[in-house]
Amino acid sequence: MKDRTYIAIDLKSFYASVECRERGLDPLDTNLVVADESRTDKTICLAVTPSLKSYGISGRGRLFEVKQRVKEANAGRQHDAPRRRLDGTSHFFSELQVNPSLAIDFIIAPPRMAYYMEYSTRIYQVYLKYIAPEDIVVYSIDEVFMDVTDYLKTYNLTPRELAMKIILDVLETTGITATAGIGTNLFLCKVAMDIVAKHITADKNGVRIAELDETKFRRELWSHQPLTDFWRVGRGIAKKLEQNGMFTMGDVALCSERNEDLLYKLFGKNAELLIDHAWGWEPTTIKAIKAYRPSSNSLSSGQVLHCPYESQKAKLVVREMTDLLVLDLVDKGLVTDQMVLTVGYDIENLTDPARRAKYHGAVEKDPYGREVPKQAHGSINLDNHTSSTRKIMCAVSELFDRIVDKNLLVRRMYVVANHVLPEADAPKKNDGVVQLDLFTDYAAEEEKQKAENAALERERKIQAATLAIKKKYGKNAILKAMNLEEGATAKDRNAQIGGHKA
């Protein structure tokens, strides 16, 4: 089989870089953070410029953490400043480097998701100047994989030269720089970008490019820590490995040779992927990714509330989410026969002594390691595949009442339409043989079915009209009464993309 060459490209601090360019500022010399300050200081920062990161600030921290770290850094600068006094501020890294009397300042830019998507589209058009779309996989808004195997000879370039040519074109077109990883498979190019490139010096344009093959991976990264730096190794997997004496990918590779059964016992079939990656192997190609079709599909909607909600207000939000999810089904020509609901409770249920005294149920830890009541989770089957708002809304409301503890405060919820398929492929209700009996009034049943079909047809026309108006005049052009109730969130979320300001 022909050896392949892959390039992964990650746009550097993408959201923050866009905000800098739009202000006429250099992303490599400006202290800027993208965060929605209107959501309080606990809001998550979507991006931080490299210069601000140099003060020990995480790229995905919370705004109050950024402010605290800058305050600490300024305290250190004041201690070292002439006369122990700071005489001004600057958000430019270069000015701060040459003038120790300046305090560190930074710009807080509210997110503009629609604008970032426009930038991402422009950058993708640059990629298409060099690589065909069938050889590109868009991994996220700021990251892509490319199979460049068949392009190196065409351009008479090495992989590094081609990567640099593409990145410099992006820089010239948009003013945004990038990091690249080159590898003999998708895993190695990703790891080269995520781990190796971070430890090399950037060139004058802020570009970093790193290369890996299987041999170099084993030589340089078998001893790398922490394990969570590696693609697809989360905290849970790393914790299990460490509990069993494996702290590096080299340890995992050694275990796969000496005691492979242990890995399968710990991770089941997922151990195969972990073992492959420990050796620097990855058989999946971009061609295989493009050809993949999932055996089952779903559509989902999730939401984390800005503050804890009582159950009735939370139910209102779930109903809003369900309503929009059904419209999404209709828009895509899809139907579902099962709804799944997950509701996560707030930490206040256990930190408030009065509420804690009333709760005697199971407890689990949230992603931050804090104890919270165990989340509610359940599913409900529909009579047949449908995209009826009325039917699905009733089912989800019934499911909410069945699984949610009415005495607990809710913080997050996820609604999923399961077993989704195109309406044309859906099996018809009562398709096939029907068992007859002497006690059923089939004439009345037939009339009832006709009335039901007519109601569904009317509902479908209303859904189609609603979608047409929303597409033409905006998502908030039509609102339901429930969207105006206290605690409703749909109106605000309609002005967002991915939960952030559009």
Model regions and ranges:
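DNA-contacting surface of Y-family translesion DNA polymerases
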Residues: A8, A103, D229, K239-V410
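Gly/Gly-Pro- and Ser/Thr-rich, intrinsically disordered tail segments characteristic of DNA damage-repair
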Residues: M1-D276, E282-I286, E445-A502
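Short, charged/polar surface micro-motifs in flexible loops or helix N-caps
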Residues: K12-F14, S38-K42, Y345-L350, V420-A424
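A glycine-rich phosphate-binding loop feature that marks nucleotide/adenosyl-phosphate handling sites
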Residues: T184-F187, D276-W279, V335-I347, L409-P422, ...
